[in-house]
Each structure stands twice: as structure tokens, then as C-alpha cells.
Amino acid sequence: GKGLPKNFNPIEFGSWMGGDRDGNPNVTSKVTKEVLLLSRWEAAKLYEKELTKLIRSYSMRKCSKKIQKLTGKSFEPYRVFLRPLRDKMRFTHRAIEQFIVNKKPLDYKKLLNSKEEILKPLRIVRESLEENQSENIASGDLLDLMRRAKCFGINLAKLDIRQESSRHSQLINE
């Protein structure tokens, strides 16, 4: 059979957990923030695991000039190139955990903040592998991870925030 296009993204997930303010006094902005952070914490943990798997697998030396320029004369350019992304996942995971458990302040600028932060370096790796006749490798775990990142983003699911309509009317009337 014919494979799916590389940029294929059939679904995106959404949730209302932590965002259902439609008459529920227990769902506050604090609850919404915690739900979003827990989702990002879980996503970062899962992406970190997948990136570690790629780093272990990608020991080849042949790479694109773009990766070579970014990694210097490394004998393992893909590993060197992917480590900062994996480390950002690890940092995001641990920082959110410290915030939730110990109320340690978060520096949002250092956290993973968009799915493009995941996809851009993965695209560079994929292009390099394809350029160097490694299409089978590029179409394996790497492509799976790219599809997951497109589907789940940095929070695993988009949050649908529902607000009781009289609050909107009150705000508009003010």
C-alpha cells in the first residue's frame, strides 16, 4: 500500500478537563493553569523518552551540511544535534514537577512553549537523513515522533475553556 504523506495530521485532541467553568465553582483559573501544566509535564516526559531513543539509535556520521555546520566536526552529529532538544524536554518536565510539588517558580521562557520547537529540529534531521539516502530511517521512529508532536502538541490536548454565558454578557455590557 501507499504510505501516508509525511506532513499528514489526521486528528488533534481536545479536552475540557480543567476548563469547564460553565457553572462549576471548583474550576478556577488556578485549576486551569495546573491542568495545562500537568499536560505539558506529561508531554515533555514522553517526548524526552522518544528523543532519548532517537539519540541512542542515530550514531551515523553522514549528515547534511546544515547539521554539520551546527555540530562542528562531530563523529555523531545527529546525537549532538538532538541533545539540546531532549535536554529542553527534560528541563521542562523537571521544572514543572518542581512547581507542582514544591511551588518553585517557573521561568516560562526556558520551558518548551510551542510544538514548532519540537518540529523544526526534527524536520532538519529528517531532511538530512533523506539527503543522505537514509529514507527508511527518516520514515521510522523519527516520522512517528513528528506525527505525535503535530497531533498532541506540547500539552497532549487543546483545552476547551467553557464559561457560563452570563459572565460574557456582563463583560460585554460593561
Task: Put a short name on every predicted segment.
Residues 1-12, 135:
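Extended, Lys/Arg-enriched charged tracts that mediate electrostatic binding to polyanionic substrates
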Residues 14, 28-30, 159:
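Generic beta-strand/beta-sheet core signal
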Residues 17-18, 153:
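Extended, charged helical/alpha-beta scaffold domains that provide interaction surfaces
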Residues 56-174:
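Extended, charge-enriched "interface" segments that sit outside catalytic cores
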Residues 13-16, 146:
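A generic hydrophobic-helix recognition signal that picks specific residues
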Residues 1, 7, 18-29, 39, ...:
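Extended, well-ordered protein cores
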